[in-house]
Amino acid sequence: MIEHQLIFPTQVFRAQYQPADELQRTVVPILLEQEKNDQKPLKYTANGYTDYGRENLLERPVFKDLKEFIDDVVVRCHKQTGLQNTPSLKSSWFSINRKYTYHEEHNHLPDTWSGVYYIQADRDHPGLTLVNPNMKSNWPGTYGRAELNDVNSSSVTCAAFTGSLIVFPVSYTHLRAHETSLH
């Protein structure tokens, strides 16, 4: 028998916000109106829209309950991971993704946690792709893979659903693949 041990396993957390449909109906028109009225000459993504850095989005009154939900989930994830102190939300923003939009590989160092909440995600949404840090060293080299699994895959994609919150360590490099749907 060969024993194995997971070294430095990483937990990625998912929680579902129950009043997601109600929040979606309320805030999607507000966010689309903000995009329409934005006079900035430089857009963050072609064919999409990202409002980043102007404010902490979750401080708006319309997001009060969602912010409380996210704060609670992140604190529970933090404790479950065995970390000390209490994390606090530093920034939040929104992106509107349309056909052909994407977001390249990046992370949000030096914080502790990153998270993505999906206000609206249809079944064709590409989800959140987390990049395996072990692959940066070209492991497993030239041997190939008999099957892809959590150990040898270069990335894992977390499905996106309306109302889902995905929380992961900030050091994890992540991306959003090209959007293929028309929405």
Regions of interest found by a model, annotated:
Residues 173-180:
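Conserved small/polar residues in nucleotide/adenosyl-binding loops
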Residues 7, 86, 107-111, 181:
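A generic structural micro-feature
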Residues 97-167:
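Catalytic core of non-heme Fe(II) oxygenases with the double-stranded beta-helix
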Residues 83-92:
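A short coil-to-beta-strand element that immediately follows conserved catalytic motifs
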Residues 1-81, 102:
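Non-heme Fe(II)/2-oxoglutarate
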Residues 55-57, 80, 95, 122-125:
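Contiguous segments within soluble domain cores/interaction surfaces
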